[in-house]
Each structure stands twice: as C-alpha cells, then as structure tokens.
Amino acid sequence: MQVEIWSDIMCPFCYIGKRRFEKAMATFEGSADIEVIWKSYQLDPNQEDVPGKSINQYLAERKGWTVDYAREMNKYVTDMAAGEGLVYDMDRAVVANSFNAHRIIQMAKAIGKGDLAEET
C-alpha cells in the first residue's frame, strides 16, 4: 500500500503529525508493506523569500490576533510537540518561503533520503 503525505516543513503541525504517523506505523503489523511517499505542499506560496519577521508577528498580522495571543497559541503548539518528543523554540522561529527547502527534500527523495530530509 502507498501512503502519500502532503506536508509543508514550515508547518509545526506537519512535523507533529509525522511523529504520530511513525508511532502508529511502529505498532502496525503490516507496516513493512507500506510505502510512504512525501509530497511537497506550501501553506503560503506567496510568502516573502527572505525571513523577516517572527512567527508571532506573522500570525498576528495574518490572523488578526495580538502578538501575545499568537505567543500563547505557539506555547500550546510547543507543548503538543513536546508530547511527541520534539523540541520547538517558537520564539526563535521565523517565517520564510519554503519552496527551496521543498526542492532540497525532493532531491533527497531521488536518492532515497526523503524521510531524512523531512527531519532536517
């Protein structure tokens, strides 16, 4: 069976979902028969190419939130990630266009390293 996973590496929920999927696969008896195919997806293809603002500023502007509310939401995401063994530092995260990162992932996929590239 093939499982296609559409993911944007800029999305913190995608990485959390990847971890949860891996945990589920580890307990699934037929996991050896499953081929995971990573597909690139950009949440915001129009995002500027040069990182220029914090994730909290970006979310406040994009969603109409206050920066404090965005920070609270990112604390929730950080806690969710920690529950999956991931360490997020959302105060240091910046928003950037992920197109080139997806290109690198697809190049890595061509040499059998797509899953590893999704992690870095």
Task: Give the positions of each predicted feature.
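Short active-site neighborhood of thiol/selenol oxidoreductases, capturing the structured segment around
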Residues: M1-P12, G17-F21, V36-K39
